[in-house]
């Protein structure tokens, strides 16, 4: 009861800022995820802003969680033992993780700590192999699963965040992000489909409650983009210190709501360094930036 009261109070406070009629402006730009790739600048992640969740191997007593849960997934019942607590950096994202071993593998499923819903599950099979089903055929299965899902809001396909697991785990991943007031938001649904038999082997909608209580989003896109461009240009200059020309591209932007209820925009920025006269055929590093809004 106390937990729900606290959530309602936070939502009321946050609604006055994130969901008001005023247009939010950028407060500052921070590095929110470490640089990935061949080069780095030595820049450090702001400790106050983290976009990476963490797992804690707590006992059910320590986490005040049920020691076992029975859920129905794809028409079949599974009973799992409490395995860990996942602490999300985003609003309403904390989950309890349960583990269920069965004959051909292991199922992990996650229960939302606020609403008690299954928001994430994945199967780990002992003999997962790449099958003959194509990306397009598996995509049709994922699209159908999305239509049947009981989720609120409008979601569209987003290949930018997809990963190809066909060779390593025998499945294709499909990502759908939510649109609110014309903005892409960091509420994504991920569905992975086996290329061997068309089974859904992973399903994630862990951030579906991120924007509960918010009816309207309004922020100054131009000012946010300019702030990110300034940061990225400075970052590129540092990467060019070794004498190699560097270019950057803002690849994607998603409005997000952090655990404390504050709002901002996540930007994916890619960098490409020239090895000589010609640029490489792909970007060789990326960072995530977070623009705090006020």
Where are these regions (language model features)?
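Long, terminal "pre-/pro-" and other extracytoplasmic accessory regions
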Residues: 4-5, 18-294
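C-terminal motif of bacterial Sec signal peptides marking the signal peptidase cleavage site
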Residues: 13-17
